[in-house]
């Protein structure tokens, strides 16, 4: 069996149906003897360019291991599902199980200190002004 990475972009009006879609696709992979190695719901994000005058989409990333018949069935389902704006299927050499950079960035943002917990900011007025480059003595030489 081969390893694949799949990213689907779902219409933002259909965001509440995403868990059911993902469940249907993962059960299809499991029924075909495959395995889901990674499943990440990136949520609603702004797209790089509009598709059919839509500027946001709900993103889902899956890394799976399955046979060619199962991936053909998935791609057929993606093509005829009107809720899916775009899909990308990439064949990988190995199973990818670590957290994606997008999800890692989101978790870093959630862990970052906010408000009162954040360290104090250095204000520019606190800097010593004694290293001023202007010489007051040279201006009187005229």
Swiss-Prot record:
UniProt feature, compositional bias: Basic and acidic residues: 105-124
UniProt KW keywords: Ribonucleoprotein, Ribosomal protein, RNA-binding, rRNA-binding
Cited SUPFAM superfamilies: Ribosomal protein S6 (SSF54995)
Cellular-component GO terms for this entry: cytosolic small ribosomal subunit
Compositional bias (Acidic residues): 125-142
Region (Disordered): 103-142
Signal peptide range in chain numbering: none
Gene Ontology MF terms: small ribosomal subunit rRNA binding; structural constituent of ribosome
BP GO annotations: translation
Pfam family, one: Ribosomal_S6
Its job: Binds together with bS18 to 16S ribosomal RNA.
Family to which the UniProt record says this protein belongs: Belongs to the bacterial ribosomal protein bS6 family.
Protein name: Small ribosomal subunit protein bS6
């Amino acid at each position: 069996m081969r390893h694949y990475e799949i990213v689907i972009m779902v219409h933002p009006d259909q965001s509440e149906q995403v868990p059911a879609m993902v469940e249907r696709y993962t059960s299809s992979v499991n029924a075909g003897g495959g395995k889901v190695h990674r499943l990440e719901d990136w949520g609603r994000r702004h797209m790089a360019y509009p598709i059919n005058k839509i500027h946001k989409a709900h993103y889902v990333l899956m890394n799976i291991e399955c046979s060619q018949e199962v991936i053909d069935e998935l791609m057929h389902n993606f093509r005829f599902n009107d809720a899916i704006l775009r899909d990308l299927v990439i064949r990988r050499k190995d199973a990818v199980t670590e957290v994606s950079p997008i999800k890692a960035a989101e978790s870093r943002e959630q862990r970052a200190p906010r408000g009162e917990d954040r360290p104090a900011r250095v204000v520019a007025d606190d800097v010593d002004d004694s290293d001023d480059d202007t010489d007051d003595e040279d201006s009187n030489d005229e």
